[in-house]
């Protein structure tokens, strides 16, 4: 193996046209790796800090020249000369160099860019695919995609309170077929929306964001689209949705408010019943952030009620942080974690969170952010860790499709070794729950 000889960062743009950090790592044996950091719109308050310049005269304050300078002038001095394959030592060195619990000094965007670029440089030097470098010979499970085809909440300008409505091709035999099923359902949905005179422009993650009469109408359109594409709802293609409940929670009143639609308010008990009714009515297999991120006891209450029936995913709740995840596991809160690289800020900590979840019987869903790039690391990471599920947007926008295309390449490379588990990737649910989802 060889040592890192140079690190260089620059400011580039993400899928929303906002600045982000790109880093390149070079080794003495000729290895080169590049990593680009994504950015979120709906963010958890406990996420690692994304360092922005704050200069209102430049990119509206969203520039990242400070983070870029931290890579070129601070991180590079520490990391150049280290062994490129010693990912853990490199990540720990950057964490120590920052010295804050939330990476607020150097910026998680600066640290993550170098972390990702390091792994790619090592894989390039060894002349192996990234998934193979990260996961070894056991990397073989192709993920069940979670495709965001209808946007609401903070991801749109419509009157829908829930942030994302997704389809999951749980009955597909391969990831290539799963992507085909998702694409066909996506186009069937577009036709159904157009037939009813609804807008079919797409949002940040490639999903449609038309106006709807209420929060249940998107589910009805998903059912219609799945059937129009020739599939059975629940059995072939299941439904998932992201509530993003922290966006709806009023901490003063201690109530959830549907402020994008009707303005109705719910106590926690009423809210849990409201969500339970929706889950019972439609073939829902997964619900993300159904409870406010700071209401731990309420998460436990919901998990006790629904945890064997449906996947309950902590995103803002866990923020890819092993401390929060360990607390949730101990309390019995949620049964799944959404994995976002930039929530925690290094590849090492991300893999630690995935492994902790799997050991506890929680599923781990490797996820994109709403502000994405052409970087396809998450496609390799989900296969490397055999996580089993990926959330990376809809069937439009190149920044989303880049990940799906990479998954198909990986499946081709793996050949007969590749295994797509579909509904079996939900090892956190009972067999009866899976049957019930198929029959709704």
UniProtKB/Swiss-Prot annotation:
PROSITE patterns recorded: ENOLASE
Cofactor: Mg(2+)
Keywords from the UniProt entry: Cytoplasm, Glycolysis, Lyase, Magnesium, Metal-binding, Secreted
Enzyme class, UniProt record, top EC level: lyase
Residues engaged in binding (2R)-2-phosphoglycerate: 163, 340, 369-370, 391
CDD domains xref list: enolase
The keyword Transport belongs to this UniProt entry's keyword annotation: no
A single GO cellular-component term on record: extracellular region
InterPro entries for this protein: Enolase, Enolase-like_C_sf, Enolase-like_N, Enolase_C, Enolase_CS, Enolase_N
Gene3D superfamilies, per database record: Enolase-like C-terminal domain, Enolase-like, N-terminal domain
Entry EC number(s): 4.2.1.11
Reactions this protein catalyses: (2R)-2-phosphoglycerate = phosphoenolpyruvate + H2O
UniProt entry tagged with the keyword Calcium: no
Cofactor note: Binds a second Mg(2+) ion via substrate during catalysis.
Family: Belongs to the enolase family.
Role description: Catalyzes the reversible conversion of 2-phosphoglycerate (2-PG) into phosphoenolpyruvate (PEP). It is essential for the degradation of carbohydrates via glycolysis.
Official protein name in the record: Enolase
Lineage, uppermost ranks: Bacteria, Bacillati, Bacillota, Bacilli, Lactobacillales
């Amino acid at each position: 193996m060889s040592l890192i000889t140079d690190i260089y960062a620059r400011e580039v743009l993400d899928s929303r046209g906002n600045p982000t950090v790109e880093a390149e790592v070079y080794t003495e044996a000729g290895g080169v790796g590049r990593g680009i950091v994504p950015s979120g719109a709906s963010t958890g308050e406990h996420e690692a800090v994304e360092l922005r310049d704050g200069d209102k005269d430049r990119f509206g304050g969203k520039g990242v020249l400070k983070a870029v300078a931290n890579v070129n002038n601070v991180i590079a001095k520490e990391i150049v000369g280290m062994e490129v394959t010693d990912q853990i030592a490199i990540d720990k060195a950057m964490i120590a160099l920052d010295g804050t619990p939330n990476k607020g000094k150097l910026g998680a965007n600066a640290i993550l860019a170098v972390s990702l670029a390091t792994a790619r440089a090592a894989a390039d030097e060894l002349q192996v695919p990234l998934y193979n470098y990260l996961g070894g010979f056991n990397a073989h499970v192709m993920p069940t995609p979670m495709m965001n085809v209808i946007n609401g909440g903070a991801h749109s300008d419509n009157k829908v309170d829930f942030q994302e409505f997704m389809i999951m091709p749980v009955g597909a035999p391969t990831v290539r077929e799963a992507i085909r099923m998702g694409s066909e359902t996506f186009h069937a949905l577009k036709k159904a929306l157009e037939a009813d005179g609804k807008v079919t422009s797409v949002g940040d993650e490639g999903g449609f964001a038309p106006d709807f009469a209420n929060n249940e109408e998107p589910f009805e359109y998903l059912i219609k689209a799945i059937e129009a594409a020739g599939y059975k709802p629940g059995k072939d293609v299941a439904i998932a949705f992201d509530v993003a409940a922290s966006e709806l929670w009023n901490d003063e009143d201690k109530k959830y408010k549907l402020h994008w639609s009707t303005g109705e308010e719910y106590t926690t008990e009423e809210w849990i019943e409201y969500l339970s009714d929706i889950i019972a009515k439609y073939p829902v297999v997964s619900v993300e952030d159904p409870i406010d991120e700071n209401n731990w006891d309420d998460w436990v209450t919901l998990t006790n009620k629904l945890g064997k029936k449906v996947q309950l995913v902590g995103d803002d709740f866990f923020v890819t942080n092993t401390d929060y995840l360990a607390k949730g596991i101990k309390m019995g809160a949620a049964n799944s974690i959404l994995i976002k690289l930039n929530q925690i800020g290094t590849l090492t900590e991300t893999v630690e969170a995935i492994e902790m979840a799997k050991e506890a019987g929680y599923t781990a869903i490797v996820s994109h952010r709403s502000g994405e790039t052409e970087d396809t690391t998450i496609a390799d990471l989900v296969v490397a860790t055999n996580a089993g599920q990926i959330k990376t947007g809809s069937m439009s926008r190149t920044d989303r499709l880049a990940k799906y295309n990479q998954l198909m390449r990986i499946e081709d490379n793996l050949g007969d070794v590749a295994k797509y588990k579909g509904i079996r990737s939900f090892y956190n649910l009972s067999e009866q729950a899976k049957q019930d989802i198929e029959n709704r």
